[in-house]
Amino acid sequence: AHELAHQRGIASEQECNFLAIAASLACGDPVYRYSGALMGYIHLGNALYRADRERWEKLRSELPEEVLADLRYHSAYWSQFEGLTATVSKSIYDTALRSYGQSDGIQSYGTVVDLLIAYY
């Protein structure tokens, strides 16, 4: 859904992330709804972790084991891209986003949290 939003002419990464989550949550297919909910949780959970780790830990402790397993899988998948290559790639991508008019660059991904909170 994120890439489809780009194809529809939305350049902003944060708006595409938000629209992908919102569209997935509104979908009739429970797999898509779960995917949207999980991505929303990841974005919101990361923000909560930075703001209030104790509250994040309480919330996380209440998640079903199946959800925790999916979160571990998600984390393991993305951790394989950590290191020098990831650092260089992020720097290049940040520059590209700024050249497309996104003044926050790669930090613009955090704006999805503000959009989710405002919408829901």
Where do the protein language model's features map onto the residues?
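Acidic/histidine-rich catalytic neighborhood
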Residues: 34-65
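Soluble non-cytosolic domains of exported or imported proteins
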Residues: 7-14, 31-35, 83-86, 107
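Pan-zinc metallopeptidase signature
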Residues: 65-120
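An active-site-proximal "capping" alpha-helix that borders the catalytic cofactor pocket
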Residues: 11-28
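Generic macromolecular interface patches on structured domains
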Residues: 26, 30-33, 51, 102
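Catalytic glutamate of the conserved HExxH
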Residues: 2-7, 18
